[in-house]
């Protein structure tokens, strides 16, 4: 049974309190939640109202949650407040780790739990808007979302196959089922009295329009939180991203903030101001910067790249230090193109962005092989070059855009440290010193579940690198090849003994560039692209 919408009077969109709005959510509804980490486009007031209502009344019950992008703060925000037994029975997320209380329910087998690649998930919502049954893609082949492996299922109570193997013209693809949502929680900055909405204070658009269309076209209720409402037909048409006829309920929250923390709107990350070139932004010389510096060596002039969250995200700052940041374009899967990537939970809140696409279109570009290079952080690597990030140490993190990005990028640069768990290093006199070794080996013999398939990458002719603070590897048909080591480390003691398998040692094994280890600009000149 579809939810009942409140009526419009004289064309005006109903304006309700958040508490009144969530009363329209019936039991068993499928709720799709917009938002990214750090409070980006998160309808926090609506989420809080729903969580509070369930605490007080134990209704609505047995909701299904769809969350394409990881929203939250890696603690108690995002969709974590909805992690109440009986409120949620089923979840399909692109990323799980930003709202860990939902992940906890999945790990404890208390909810049915699926993970689609983030880009695939937003594309299935677009398919749901068009009343298409799903999408067909080769994104995810050879990884844990492949039905020949785990099929995107995250725990033992998740049984139904949402992903199927299909064949067209003798080519294998994955079919991802589209799930049509009944309720949407979306957010904008301003709307008029008919629901037409603009995003002037926001840092991106994500897939707000796709979600609204999917819910509207399937007879559901689109609930939109905004900071203010204005007279009808007074918003500039080129600024309107959500047409009013898609919106069923508006919740006005004058205290709505751009990001978590309640700070005033940052006009640099909203794209209104441009940071002057003289503004100093730099990283201290540590293992994080060391990896970012070495990763920059894989960039070429004119390239279009992607940078992911984690240790890889310092590459933009390093390029700015070296004066070559304008010689290539870095993108983020959530939509930003160009500029300086932010770090931490609000990843994607870029400064000096050149353009912002909707997230679904950004992933179309990625899936089609548009990226020349990508920089992604890794959790674990095995002897076949497979990489794991979506689940480790028993914790469900989810893939985010990792699978979408790494599947077709012409060059893939994985960034991380060789070990984890209290690793401490220092860089002195142009050398790397391991002060305290990490407790956990990250290069293991076999991955239990695969987020990136080395085999598929080789079949597609992709160039794969693994960059750590003390060693650089490349992927070939016979496995990982060690091609560089840091000055100051011992090959056997500091590298080979800290891996569960022995890589092929390149006969041309060399030291990593000495400039990486000096606390001054490297004088790096970006190479021309090969033709």
Roles of regions detected by a PLM:
Residues 2-5, 9-23, 38-54, 66, ...:
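Conserved phosphate- and dinucleotide-binding cores of soluble alpha/beta proteins
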Residues 30-35, 64-67:
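Short glycine-rich or small-residue beta-strand-to-loop segments that form or flank ligand, phosphate
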Residues 31-33, 304-308:
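Short glycine-rich phosphate-binding loop at a beta-alpha junction
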Residues 22, 61, 281-284, 293-300, ...:
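Glycine-rich phosphate/ribose-binding loops and adjacent secondary-structure elements
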Residues 36, 189, 309-311:
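Short, well-ordered beta-to-alpha junction loops that form the rim of enzyme active sites
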Residues 50-63, 328:
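Beta-solenoid repeat scaffold
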Residues 196, 274-287, 294-306, 479-480, ...:
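Glycine-rich phosphate/diphosphate-binding loops and the adjacent beta-loop-alpha structural elements
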